[in-house]
Amino acid sequence: MARSGRYKVKFRRRREGKTDYMKRLALLKSRKPRVVVRRTNRYIIVQFIGFKGEGDEVIAYAFSKELEKYGWPYGGKNLPAAYLTGYLAAMRAKKAGVTEAILDIGRFPSTKGSRLYAALKGVLDAGIDVPHSPEILPDEDRIRGEHIASFAEKLEEEGSLERQFSDYLRRGADPKIISEAFESVLERISAMSNG
């Protein structure tokens, strides 16, 4: 690999594709806490991170698996779960004194209306100021899960609802009423965070 004196080995996290150091430096120059949104194959993670000389400090944290404690039976990777996770993390960050932040989506592609921006919408609706473009946020109908409910109704007419939503149905969650469940979980998060 490094056979001559002119070859420079990149940082390990850059080689692994985990960190874009130029983007990280630009975010740190803002001197604001970062809203770090990460998605896995099953969950959404939202963290408020502050910079310290010896390393980053986690100010507040929310993981979409925590939504089960608030009565959310619909899994942790869909758009409504991303919104609720962002909202929960922002409520915790407000308790810690955060009023503004800057978004860090890492090396994920910036796609309009994605789960990453649904989490950002949850942070914004909780009252934390984050610079953003309003066009990038998903529609209110998608945030409440109405696209999932309409798709479930269409599949029920075709007779293939059990095949597509087997995980929800196994947990006793009806995908056609996801919007009502979203509203009740949002109220519970607001009540527990304010109370």
Swiss-Prot record:
Gene3D superfamilies, per database record: 3.30.420.100
Record-level GO cellular component terms: cytosolic large ribosomal subunit
Keyword set, alphabetical order: Ribonucleoprotein, Ribosomal protein, RNA-binding, rRNA-binding
Keyword Nucleotidyltransferase included in the entry's annotation: no
Domain of life according to the entry: Archaea
Alphabetical list of InterPro entries matching this protein: Rbsml_uL18_euk (IPR005485)
GO biological process: ribosomal large subunit assembly; translation
Task of the protein: This is one of the proteins that bind and probably mediate the attachment of the 5S RNA into the large ribosomal subunit, where it forms part of the central protuberance.
Protein name according to UniProt: Large ribosomal subunit protein uL18
